[in-house]
UniProtKB/Swiss-Prot annotation:
It is a multi-pass membrane protein. Its main location: membrane. This is Melanocyte-stimulating hormone receptor. Keywords: Cell membrane, G-protein coupled receptor, Glycoprotein, Lipoprotein, Membrane, Palmitate, Receptor, Transducer, Transmembrane, Transmembrane helix. A lipid is attached at C315 (S-palmitoyl cysteine). Coiled coil: none annotated. The chain crosses the membrane at residues 38-63, 73-93, 119-140, 164-183, 192-211, 241-266, 280-300. One of its GO terms (molecular function) is melanocyte-stimulating hormone receptor activity. Belongs to the G-protein coupled receptor 1 family. It comes from the Eukaryota. One of its GO terms (cellular component) is plasma membrane.
């Protein structure tokens, strides 16, 4: 779990080019004086991870406690929270271990440290993949609930949801091991990027279609009650704003990391790309920020879940 300059080892394999030249530590004339490197203090990294950890633990606890929340939709939300929890927890663990090793407070053999680092990398990578998958699964679940409302409970059953969850977890672990083992192959990095773009397109298409259906429904109600057109327009603008925020946060938090992977393949030695590579820790911090925001978007908006969460917090006191 060594640190290269200011670069954390976490997913360090994804922060190296297929060649032996490292991205960090380049000469000043290679990146230029204009190159901006955003430093993420370890304290901030740990704080973000802790906030995400607490939030997602609360979501998992609330869903596990309330049997009314044991439905396919909340099953996906719970697994999303668990994935985000693992993303944050593995980042916190590696940061803490790295700091202890640097301070000399933790003595370990190089082989042990390397094995620990590999395990943490697999957990981090698999939880990131599963998080993206569950975001897509939630979008599909909501789409079916709107466009196939009468058949929803026969299409999306709890056993099917559990099988889908198991398949996502198994595939995420297997593919993460494959990606980390062959990280120096351009095809592997491109597969990760294509996977991210596929999830982005899937979510965008489904949510835009759902927004269009909601606007049509609102327009029909407005005509039925002979309301004025501005009311329908206001609903459409509100829905569009919500959709923009949802997809915007997803792209803002995940996009830079996958841009990083794309540039590793396209321009590993270019000065501009080398400058972007310096901000790898910032891209990881944005993913942790997404793990903080996910519960606010998908979980805490549920009145039933908030009520259960309140009971859990009161009982803990």
């Amino acid at each position: 779990m060594p640190v290269q300059g200011s670069q954390r080892r976490l997913l360090g394999s994804l922060n190296s080019t297929p060649t032996a030249t490292p991205h960090l530590g380049l000469a000043a004339n290679q990146t230029g004086a204009w190159c901006l490197e955003v430093s993420i203090p370890d304290g901030l990294f740990l704080s973000l991870g802790l906030v995400s950890l607490v939030e997602n633990v609360l979501v998992v606890t609330a869903i596990a406690k309330n049997r009314n929340l044991h439905s396919p939709m909340y099953c996906f939300i719970c697994c999303l929270a668990l994935s985000d929890l693992l993303v944050s927890g593995s980042n916190m663990l590696e940061t803490a271990v790295t700091l202890l090793l640097e301070a000399g407070a933790l003595a370990a053999r190089a082989a042990v440290v390397q094995q620990l680092d590999n395990v943490i990398d697999v957990i981090t990578c698999s939880s990131m993949l599963s998080s993206l998958c569950f975001l897509g699964a939630i979008a599909v679940d909501r789409y079916i609930s709107i466009f196939y409302a009468l058949r929803y409970h026969s299409i999306v059953t709890l056993p099917r949801a559990r099988r889908a969850v198991a398949a996502i977890w198994v595939a995420s672990v297997l593919f993460s091991m494959l990606f980390i083992a062959y990280y120096d192959h351009a095809a592997v990095l491109l597969c990760l990027v294509v996977f991210f773009l596929a999830m982005l397109v899937l979510m965008a298409v489904l949510y835009v279609h759902m927004l269009a259906r909601a606007c049509q429904h609102a327009q029909g109600i407005a005509r039925l009650h002979k309301r004025q057109r501005p009311a329908h327009q206001g609903f459409g603008l509100k829905g569009a704003a919500t959709l923009t925020i949802l997809l915007g946060i997803f792209f803002l938090c995940w996009g830079p990391f996958f841009l990083h992977l794309t540039l590793i393949v396209l321009c590993p030695q270019h000065p501009t790309c080398s400058c972007i590579f310096k901000n790898f820790n910032l891209f990881l911090a944005l993913i942790i920020c997404n793990a903080i925001i996910d519960p606010l978007i998908y979980a805490f908006r549920s009145q039933e879940l908030r009520r259960t969460l309140k009971e859990v917090l009161l009982c803990s006191w």
